[in-house]
């Protein structure tokens, strides 16, 4: 009985950290945004990653604060073609593009000020 209760707590505890998020990255949106001179923020995540969940919370707020910036994301383990296209090897990667160039890349960053600074980089 005790083992069953512990197992239930562990399973529900892990699932409570799962990210409910969808892949929004497409080549078409990425290329069009670049052509339009927009800043593009790309986030690589995994649904069971705690660091990714922290980043999602920050990036969701950033979408409201940086209205002219395009935010795209993809699930690293499911969307391997996107990861290869962008040369992204790890969950928790945030990449910023401006004027068809990568201007910033971080892995594992969860500090809001640092992420915002990365987005503001020109």
Regions picked out by a protein language model, each given a short descriptive name:
Residues 4-13:
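Sec-dependent N-terminal signal peptides
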Residues 10, 17-37, 118:
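N-terminal leader/targeting and pre-domain segments
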Residues 27, 31, 56-60, 80-83, ...:
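Extracytoplasmic/secreted envelope proteins and their assembly/folding machinery
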Residues 35-47:
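Short active-site neighborhood of thiol/selenol oxidoreductases, capturing the structured segment around
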Residues 44, 68-80:
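Thiol-based oxidoreductase modules, predominantly thioredoxin-like and allied folds used
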Residues 51-65:
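Typically the conserved alpha-helix immediately C-terminal to a functionally engaged Cys/Sec
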Residues 86-95:
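Structural micro-motif
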Residues 98-122:
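Non-catalytic, surface beta->alpha helical segment in thiol-disulfide oxidoreductase systems
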């Amino acid at each position: 009985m005790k083992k069953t209760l512990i197992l239930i707590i562990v399973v529900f505890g892990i699932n409570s950290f799962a990210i409910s998020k969808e892949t929004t990255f497409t080549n078409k949106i990425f290329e069009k945004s670049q052509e339009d001179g927009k800043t593009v923020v790309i986030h690589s995540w995994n649904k069971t990653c705690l660091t990714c969940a922290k980043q999602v919370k920050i990036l969701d707020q950033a979408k409201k604060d940086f209205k002219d910036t395009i935010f795209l994301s993809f699930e690293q383990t499911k969307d391997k073609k996107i990861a290869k296209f962008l040369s992204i090897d790890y969950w928790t990667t945030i990449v910023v593009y401006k004027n068809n160039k990568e201007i910033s890349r971080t892995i594992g960053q969860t500090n809001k000020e640092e992420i915002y600074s990365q987005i503001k980089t020109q």
